[in-house]
């Protein structure tokens, strides 16, 4: 920096390799389901339930997504990616009359709660110009008419291929697209107010497993989360009243969660009303996955007129985020300060002998009748009691291992750009050791013992992106 001038601000660039591995990143959840409005197959980061309501329309009887998001924030969650999926939902249609035709616009986001209106004017356009026009688009809140979003496009033309063609310009709009051929002449100016849809949007049909799963090639359904760098918890709320995701959706979600290093939360089927039904259901299903958390029973709301049992997958996701923030993923959920909502009670009483049988099958138990003391007990994954993945039958062990592997993965990606393999190995080993020391000091390991080994050698060749660097970790959670 020149001695002649010092603005009092010094900017220093710090390479990723100089940054410590983050041991305290906020746990992030992802929910996939049906909503009243909002972008389709696009992960949207939501930090409050009010924000969810503004973007996706809030709670809705046709979907459990809104209730799950509300549970999530009520129980300590702070950030969740929401992916809206739909089954043949349609956007509202607006028609702008023109001298010899009509300009048809279709709302980008489908749904009955997506209210779009439009106005046409010729302000700032010479009187002898009969081609240019201005377009004002607004998204308004249902009922109140409050303007939520507004887009203004000036000096548009109808003729395709020309500069400022309405068809080309509206490709960038987040509200509408041009549908069908455009008229030869510009649309007529709106006399007063705005033009409302001639055809309202629709919410489509109930979701199928294929809507939830989506397409890897198209980035739809759960694969829309490929746009997100990292998720810790994945949850598919029941797609409709009295339903849970089917086998195809569960299998796809299991595989996706495993690939992303995330934990999948599964709600129990509503048909499970007794302990023996849950045990039989688990054995018949044959689920054995260390990356899946499930529970039994569902809950009921104290003093509510509702007679049905509710899923609490959203609440459990929130509790996991709260647990990680306050204690760490190596701790159990069954402890003070991590109870379910005071109004939630187990749908059925679970005796201690039955609880043992449920845990043996890999189901965590919702237990406790005292207000404010309904807990998630068991700390098991669906690998419990099986030969496959039995080392990760413990929920705390599996979550700690996922946290360690994900943090190291994110914190060492710079190594592929290293030209000196020996230096990269040494730096990685040092950083990982420091990271494990932080976890050890926080109480993550029994007896504070752990081992870090990074493959050694004096090779000066660049790191092979295909082979990578071998890192061996040993610890006792």
Question: What are these model-predicted stretches?
Answer:
Residues 12, 177-179, 183, 193-196, ...:
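Generic N-terminal simple sequence motifs
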Residues 214-219:
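Phosphate-interacting basic helix/loop segments used at nucleotide- and nucleic-acid interfaces
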């Amino acid at each position: 920096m020149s001695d002649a001038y010092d603005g009092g601000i010094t900017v220093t660039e710090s390479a990723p390799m100089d940054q410590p591995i983050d041991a305290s990143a906020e746990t992030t959840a992802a929910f996939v389901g049906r909503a009243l409005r909002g972008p389709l197959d696009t992960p949207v980061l939501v930090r409050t339930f009010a924000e969810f309501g503004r973007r996706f329309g809030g709670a809705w009887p046709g979907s459990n997504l809104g209730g799950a998001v509300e549970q999530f924030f009520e129980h300590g969650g702070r950030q969740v990616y929401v992916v809206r999926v739909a089954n043949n939902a349609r956007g509202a249609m607006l028609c702008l009359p023109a001298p010899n035709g009509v300009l048809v616009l279709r709302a980008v986001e489908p749904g009955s709660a997506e209210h779009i209106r439009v106005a046409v004017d010729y302000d700032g356009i010479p009187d002898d110009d009969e081609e240019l026009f201005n377009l004002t688009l607004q998204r308004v809140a249902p009922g109140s008419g409050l303007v939520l979003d507004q887009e203004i496009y000036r000096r548009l033309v109808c003729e395709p291929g020309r500069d400022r063609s309405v068809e080309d310009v509206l490709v960038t709009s987040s509200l509408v697209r041009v549908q069908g051929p455009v008229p030869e002449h510009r649309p007529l100016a709106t006399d007063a107010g705005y033009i409302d849809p001639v055809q309202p949007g629709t919410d489509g049909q109930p979701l199928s497993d294929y809507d939830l799963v989506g397409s890897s090639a198209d980035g739809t359904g759960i694969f829309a989360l490929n746009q997100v760098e990292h998720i810790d918890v994945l949850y598919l709320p029941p797609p409709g009243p009295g339903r849970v995701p089917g086998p195809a959706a569960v299998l796809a979600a299991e595989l996706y969660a495993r690939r992303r290093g995330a934990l999948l939360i599964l709600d129990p089927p509503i048909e499970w009303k007794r302990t023996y039904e849950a045990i039989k259901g688990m054995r018949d299903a044959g689920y054995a996955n260390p990356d899946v958390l499930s529970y039994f029973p569902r809950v009921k709301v104290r003093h509510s007129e509702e007679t049905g049992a509710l899923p609490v997958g959203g609440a459990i996701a929130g509790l996991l985020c709260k647990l990680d923030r306050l204690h760490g993923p190596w701790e159990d959920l069954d402890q003070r300060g991590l109870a379910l909502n005071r109004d939630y009670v187990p749908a059925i009483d679970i005796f201690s002998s039955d609880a043992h049988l449920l845990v043996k099958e890999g189901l965590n138990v919702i237990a406790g009748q005292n207000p404010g003391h309904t807990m998630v007990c068991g700390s098991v994954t669906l690998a419990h009691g099986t030969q496959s993945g039995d080392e990760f039958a413990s929920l705390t062990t599996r979550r700690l291992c996922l946290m360690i592997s994900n943090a190291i993965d994110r914190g060492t990606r710079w190594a592929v750009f290293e030209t000196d393999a020996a230096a990269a190995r040494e730096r990685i080993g040092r950083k990982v050791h420091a990271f494990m020391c932080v976890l050890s000091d926080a109480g993550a390991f029994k007896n504070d013992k752990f081992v870090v080994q990074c493959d050694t050698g004096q090779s000066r060749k660049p790191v092979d992106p295909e082979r990578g660097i071998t890192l061996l970790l040993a610890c006792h959670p």
